[in-house]
């Protein structure tokens, strides 16, 4: 998955799968390699599958510095009401990008794309 290598190199460890509150849209951002962009929206959102990771606090700043634009780290609201730090995308980067929210998450989208290839 995009940036998983950077997460593990920073000492992060996978905790669990979860989902966002139904306040987000997921986009396929242009360019290669394929990467997702998660955007919080006012209305017409969907719950999107996400992964939760734990990272040592001393590595967090270094990791954030490696996140390429138009991605950023912000606060996500999960379906169970928890708030966590996670990847978001700048709204301007979604102009003309394919909305893939109907797949429910990046892994599901990639599985469908692979099956269609």
Role assignments for model-derived ranges:
Residues 1-117:
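Glycine-aromatic micro-motifs
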């Amino acid at each position: 998955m995009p940036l998983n290598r950077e997460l593990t190199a920073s000492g992060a460890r996978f905790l669990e799968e979860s989902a966002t509150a139904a306040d987000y849209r997921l986009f396929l951002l242009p360019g290669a390699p394929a990467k997702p962009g998660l955007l919080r929206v006012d209305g017409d959102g969907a719950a999107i599958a996400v992964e939760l990771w734990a990272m040592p606090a001393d590595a967090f700043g270094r990791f954030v510095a490696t996140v390429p634009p138009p991605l950023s780290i912000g606060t996500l609201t999960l379906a169970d009401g928890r708030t966590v730090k996670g990847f978001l995308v700048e709204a301007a980067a979604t102009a003309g990008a394919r909305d893939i929210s109907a797949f429910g998450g990046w892994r599901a989208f990639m599985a469908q794309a692979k099956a269609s290839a």
